[in-house]
Structures are given as C-alpha cells and as structure tokens.
C-alpha cells in the first residue's frame, strides 16, 4: 500500500480545521467545612458579596462573608449531603425570583417555586431580590388612601398608598387578623397584594390561604411562604423575594400592598446566620447591621411618580404613578416596644398601629390603642368625608381615657364628666368590629356620623352593636344610591350631610334595633 503524502497532509489539515476547542474559565473552590447550613469555601478569589455559588446537585449557596482565606456562604435548602472536599463554582449572578401576574392566586416559596400543588408558575421574567429603593426625585407624596375596612384604623390611623405602617403587639392580639382583613378589603380596589409568611407554622399559613380563598381575595394575592421548618437562609430572604414581586406592580404604574408577617422572626433568622458566620454580636446578640436589614427592605415601599413609571416601562405606561404600601408586623414580648428590633422598625416606618393584650382580652377588637398608635401621613391620605367625620373620634377617646383614669379616684362626678365618659364608652363600643367583616367607606362614614352628631346619646351601651347593625341594614335597603355615591367619590358637602342626617333621623324614629 502506497502512502500519498499530499493526501495525508490534506487529511491532517481537514481534521485540524474541524477540531473545535471551547475553553471555559470559571472560578472554582473547595468546601472546607459544612455545619448548620453554613459552608466555608477555599479558592473563590473573585466571588462577590451576595453572589450565588453553584453547589453539586443543582443547588445554590449565597456568599455572605468574604474573608482573607475563605468565603462563608449560607446554603439555600438541604445541606446534609454536602461534604468537605466537594467542588463549587461562582455563577456571577445574584439571587433572582420570578415576577409577574402569573403569580397572583399562587402560594410560592422564597425562591418563587410553587408549593400549592397547582402546577408550574407562569412569570413575566425574573427580578433580583435585592434592589435599590427609588431615590428622592423619583418619589411622590402619599395622598391616596388604602382602606383597611376597619373603622378604628381608617378613622384614626389612616394608611396611604406608598406608606409603611407598622402593626405591633404581643402574640395573639390580632396582628395577622388585621393584615388579612386589609387584604380581603382590596378585593375590588384594584390593589394587588403580597402576603409574606416568615417562620410560621405550615398549618397557620394553610388556614390564612383558605380564608383568603373563601373571601375571594386570593385571586389578586401572592402568598410567599418560608415556614418554621425551613432553613434560616430562606426565612431571612423571604421578605426580599416578596418585595421584588410587589415591585413588579409598583414599577408599572399600579398599586400593591405587601404584608411582612413577621419581621421579628426574620431578624431572629438573620441573627442565627450571623452568629454561625462568626460575626460579632451586639445588643440582644443581634449583629450590628440588623437596622440595615429592615431599612433597605422597607425603603423599597414607596409611591413613585409618573416619570419614573414612564422611564421604567420605556414609554409604554404614561401619566400613572405606582405605589407599594408595606404593613410590616412586629411581635413584642410583654408589650415592650423599647426592645431593639421594635424600636428600629418604629423609627423606619411612617407610623404604627399598636395592639394591646389588655384591650384584646377585654373584648375590644381590633385591640388598637389609639393613644400610642399614629400615622405620620395622617389626613393627607384620607377621603374628604372620613377626614371630616373622624376628627372628633380621636379627641373623644383621648378625653375618655383621661377621665376614666381620673374617675377611679373621684367619688362624685358632675353631669358634663358623666356625659363625656358615657360618650367615650359608646364610641369605644362602636369601634369594635368582627374579623372578616371589613366595612366600606360609606358604611364607616354613616357610623362615624352617628357618633359625631350625638345620635348615640340615648342608646344603651349594650345596644350600640345592634344599633349599628340595624342602621347599616336600613341604609343598604333604603339609601343604596347615596352609599354608592360616597364610596365612589368620598366627597362631603352640605347636601351629603343633610342626607346622612335624614337617614339617621328616619332610622331613630323606627326604634328598630
């Protein structure tokens, strides 16, 4: 057999031309220790703070401690099969979660994966869990209300779109109930809701989801869950994931409401991670940056102006402002609002609704303490009619509390003082409300008008509740158009005042309560 050198050289050239070498450089490291969900890695020289590190088995860890000779990272999910010597890689990405309308009506975990058994989640893309809050120039002042459906809150502690209002109180004082009712009340308001459950029992979350479904509010709500059985890393990141999902609506000129239930458990999870990473502990063993943990989250709740929305949507949405309203929940121990985390969150938020165990146990529910509850946005976020009618309620309750304390020591009281005490008791009774029964603006206005104009004077204290129920039923039956008008416009003028007076005069004449 004769070898032709030309043929051989051609064949070699052909093979060389077809030879395809793809060189891929990636930063690789080695696990040197695994304990309590924390891994220490050698060799990741170029890793960034907060970067996702790819682990064997399609899992990830997040780099939190960048030290001279190693990287401390927290594992997202189970870590039992990770061992010393395993190879890990940098990804060059930070954690992102799916966002979009497809998430409405779904229950997802911190990573945006469905946990409700309804199949895969449709999304409009992904968004980073950590985002920079809108700047000063991009914001607009808060002047539109978010109606919670609670008389005591909407009258005395009004919440505006884009506000951060803290709900604070001991365990079992109705904090979650208040937040869930606020979500239920947004059924027809166009406000999209996000409920973030942090460190709660799975049975409690299932109950909340069932209640939202029963009241027709789940369809416009995203539920983000990091239960008590999940890792500290997932509990720490859950609020940021929920916030990214809420920002999707804010940045497109829509209104959204987000509930963080509760941030005390998130702070505990973050404390656990920090101590395991051997960061120096501070007050109550929390790390030094626990204030920043909450401030960077809550600053993302804002009302953004039309220019911001137009720039974000590249001109698709014009002339619309967007908002993300936050209702963070904090659990106190024995009413101590001066503890570390409660004082931090109080100083970050635009007001707080303080729920008291003593009021709750006395049957005053919602157990709002009007003395130390405040909204720093105030009347700017109220409808005209609520602003006009609610002014005297807070004053009446403040005077009542003062006189009630004084009357314990005084044996004989004059008529004026007795009248004020009686009025205060009736207003307190009137502000009671059952769970899952939010009220419209018109219904609240009618009830407040009755209290403000002295229509409760001759009603027995025990009959105030039945008087209110009968009055609302009468108004719904006989004056539905007026109630509809008030709900749509929120206006208050002499004509509406005369009509409200007419309703109450006619109703009181019937004596049907």
UniProtKB/Swiss-Prot annotation:
Regarding the membrane, this protein is recorded as: Peripheral membrane protein
Binding residue positions for ATP: 169-176
Q: Where in the cell is it found?
A: Cell inner membrane
Paired cysteines (S-S): none
Family annotation (PANTHER family): ATP SYNTHASE SUBUNIT ALPHA, MITOCHONDRIAL
User: Mind telling me which HAMAP family this protein's record contains?
Assistant: ATP_synth_alpha_bact
Q: Which proteins does it associate with, and in what oligomeric form? A: F-type ATPases have 2 components, CF(1) - the catalytic core - and CF(0) - the membrane proton channel. CF(1) has five subunits: alpha(3), beta(3), gamma(1), delta(1), epsilon(1). CF(0) has three main subunits: a(1), b(2) and c(9-12). The alpha and beta chains form an alternating ring which encloses part of the gamma chain. CF(1) is attached to CF(0) by a central stalk formed by the gamma and epsilon chains, while a peripheral stalk is formed by the delta and b chains.
Family assignment from sequence similarity? Belongs to the ATPase alpha/beta chains family.
Q: What is this protein called?
A: ATP synthase subunit alpha
**Which organism is this protein's natural source?**
Yersinia enterocolitica serotype O:8 / biotype 1B (strain NCTC 13174 / 8081)
Gene name per UniProt? atpA
């Amino acid at each position: 057999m004769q070898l032709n050198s030309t043929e051989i050289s051609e064949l070699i050239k052909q093979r060389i031309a077809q030879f395809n070498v793809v060189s891929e450089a990636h930063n690789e490291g080695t696990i040197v220790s695994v304990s309590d969900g924390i891994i220490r890695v050698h060799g990741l020289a170029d890793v960034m703070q907060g970067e996702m590190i790819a682990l064997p088995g399609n899992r990830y860890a997040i780099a939190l401690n960048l030290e001279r000779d190693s990287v401390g990272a927290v594992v997202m999910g189970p870590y039992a099969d990770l061992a010393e010597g395993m190879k890990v890689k940098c990804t060059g990405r930070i954690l992102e979660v799916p966002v979009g309308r497809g998430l409405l009506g779904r229950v997802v975990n911190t990573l945006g994966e469905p946990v409700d058994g309804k199949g895969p989640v449709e999304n409009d893309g992904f968004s980073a869990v950590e985002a920079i809050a809108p700047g000063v120039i991009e914001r607009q002042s808060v002047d539109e209300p978010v109606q919670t459906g609670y008389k005591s809150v909407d009258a005395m502690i009004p919440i505006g779109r884009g506000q951060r209002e803290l709900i604070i109180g001991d365990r079992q004082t109705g904090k979650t109930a208040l937040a869930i009712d606020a979500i239920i009340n947004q059924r027809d308001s166009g406000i999209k809701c996000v409920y973030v459950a942090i460190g709660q029992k799975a049975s409690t979350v299932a109950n909340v989801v069932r209640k939202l479904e029963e009241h027709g509010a789940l369809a416009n709500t995203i539920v983000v869950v990091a239960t008590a059985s999940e890792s500290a890393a997932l509990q720490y990141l859950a609020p940021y994931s929920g916030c990214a999902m809420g920002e999707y609506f804010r940045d497109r000129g829509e209104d959204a409401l987000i509930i963080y239930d509760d941030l005390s458990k998130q702070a505990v999870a973050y404390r656990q991670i920090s101590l395991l990473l051997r960061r120096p502990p501070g007050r109550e063993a929390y790390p030094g940056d626990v204030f920043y943990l909450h401030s960077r989250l809550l600053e993302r709740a804002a009302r953004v102006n039309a220019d911001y929305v137009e720039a974000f949507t590249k001109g698709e949405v014009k002339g619309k402002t967007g908002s993300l309203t936050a209702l963070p929940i904090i659990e106190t121990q024995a009413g101590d609002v001066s503890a570390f985390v409660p004082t931090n969150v109080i100083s970050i938020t635009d007001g707080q609704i303080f729920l008291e165990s003593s009021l709750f146990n006395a049957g005053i529910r919602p157990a709002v303490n009007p003395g130390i509850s405040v909204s720093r946005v105030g009347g700017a976020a109220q409808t005209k009619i609520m602003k006009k009618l609610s002014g005297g309620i807070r004053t009446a309750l403040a005077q009542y509390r003062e006189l009630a304390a004084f009357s314990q020591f005084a044996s004989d009281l004059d008529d004026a003082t007795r009248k004020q005490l009686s009025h205060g008791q009736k207003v307190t009774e009137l502000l009671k409300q059952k769970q899952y029964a939010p009220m419209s603006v018109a219904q609240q206005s009618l009830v407040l008008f009755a209290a403000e104009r002295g229509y409760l004077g001759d009603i027995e204290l025990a009959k105030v509740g039945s008087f209110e129920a009968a009055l609302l039923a009468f108004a719904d039956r006989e004056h539905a158009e007026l109630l509809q008008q008030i709900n749509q416009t929120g206006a208050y003028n002499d004509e509406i005042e005369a009509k409200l007076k007419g309703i109450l005069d006619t109703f009181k004449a019937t004596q049907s309560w």
